[in-house]
Design a protein with these regions (language model features):
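Short aromatic/hydrophobic "clamp" motif used to bind/position activated sugar donors
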Residues: 35-36
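Conserved core of the sugar-phosphate nucleotidyltransferase
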Residues: 44-129
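Residue-level signal for inorganic ion chemistry
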Residues: 19, 39, 68, 92, ...
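Conserved strand-to-helix beginnings and helix N-cap segments that scaffold or border functional pockets
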Residues: 16-17, 47-50, 141
Length: 154
């Protein structure tokens, strides 16, 4: 497979926009049905998670991996279900490109891919796919040490 590099932006949102602009021609030509967006901060995402996310987006329009919060972490005053959201996240390519273009025009900057889709395509059914507790985000130096311990588990 060929590897192509797209320069990122100052924010996650801008990096995703740049990638979608790079893919624009193929998306508009109907050569790309789905886009999966993943960040390098979660290096332990499994192939099975990517497959599940792609299948969920193909069937429903969008898919995000989630991990249920421990009840001790939840704000019991809120009625809606709250979960930790991970990457990769996947959506149908045409709508995702349109969402990011609308975001660029309006100045919207989403915290993740799903936030941008929800802002501009609230009717897209984004399904929650079971995430992976080992798909940790590397934010601090100690996270890297934990990830190194988890590699043999996978």
């Amino acid at each position: 497979a060929n590897t192509e590099i797209v320069h990122g932006g100052a924010t996650r949102h801008e990096s995703e926009y740049n990638a979608l602009q790079y893919l624009r021609g193929d998306i508009e030509a109907g050569l790309i049905d789905l886009v999966l967006i993943h960040d390098g901060a979660r290096p332990l995402a499994t192939a099975e998670l990517f497959v599940a996310i792609a299948a969920g987006a193909q069937t429903h329009g969008g898919a995000i991996p989630t991990i249920a919060l421990d009840p001790r972490e939840m704000d019991t005053a809120r009625e809606e279900t709250i979960a930790r959201v991970q990457t990769p996240q996947s959506f149908r390519a045409t709508q995702l490109l349109q969402a990011y273009e609308k975001a660029a025009v309006s100045g919207f900057v989403g915290t993740d891919t799903a936030a941008c889709m929800e802002a501009f395509f609230p009717d897209v059914n984004t399904v929650a796919v079971p995430g992976d507790i080992f798909n940790i985000k590397i934010t601090y130096p100690q996270d890297l040490a934990i990830a190194e311990l988890l590699i043999p588990v996978q």
